Amino acid sequence: MEKVNFNKRYKRAKAASLFWTLFIGAGAVLGAVGMFVDPTGKAAGMDGLLPGMQKLPFANVLFQNLIFPGIALLLVNGVPNFVAAAFLFKNKKAGAQLTAVFGFTLMLWITIQFVIYPLNVLSTLYFVFGIAELIAGYVCYVGYMQSTFVFDEKDYPSVGADGSKLVVYFSRLSYTKKLAYQIADEQKAEILQLKALEKTDGYLGFWWSGRFGMHRWGMPIENAGVDLKKYDEITICSPIWVFGLSAPVREFCKRQNGNVKTVNYVLTHFMNSKFSSAAREMDALLGVNHKSFRSFRCRFGRYKEIK
């Protein structure tokens, strides 16, 4: 496998994930060792835990001392978190996935404590730690999938062979771009990328794009200088922003009203929905009824057409 150039999102989330897995794992191991060394819990002041444990199933067998709770703590929150950390150090996808899973596991563990013990600061803190670990793991997973997404324009040699067709696209993260190139390669069509004049990349770009999406605004785009009237057929590829058409494509359609002969639409999104409303909006903006409309669920570069 080629060396991956991991993005900032992955690197930051990986650092956070490593912190939480090592911190929680080390705390669990130390707690388990303390229970093994002193099963009564009196030396470390943990004997107060045993009365609450009597509410649990098989308490008369498993919870008469701290040996079994120590084993459970080690196997549920100790060793697994160190395993996740090891995968993170090696930049494996499993590291991010396990971090999220073990954050949720910690939340379940603390939920049991909420049931058998009075509300206390330590349990509440560790529940928050579990939430933080889950979030760090998920963001790390997203960053990993984005960083390992593969796209190369050279893989589509037939693009541009037929000057009567054009594929137009806008893409923040290259997911829509890849699909646009696949379609252009199949049609041998020329291809045109829409470039926004507003910030759309990175964290800030995500939220800024969301603002345009929420208000259903158009977003200023560079003048492509292409005469659409010379093409017999055009395919427009757009991601979905906040359950609607992306702002740069909305602006493009406004500008090209009356200039398109035959048009097809391709949408990409994260949902199991077709988003037919976006196709109707493009029809209204362009002043033409579309020839075809396809909708693809795209989750980190994995595409599924929604029929």
What label would you give each PLM region?
Residues V4, R12, I131, I135-K307:
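Active-site-proximal alpha-helix that buttresses catalytic centers in soluble enzyme cores
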Residues E2-V159, K254-R255, S276:
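Topology signature of small-to-medium multi-pass alpha-helical membrane proteins
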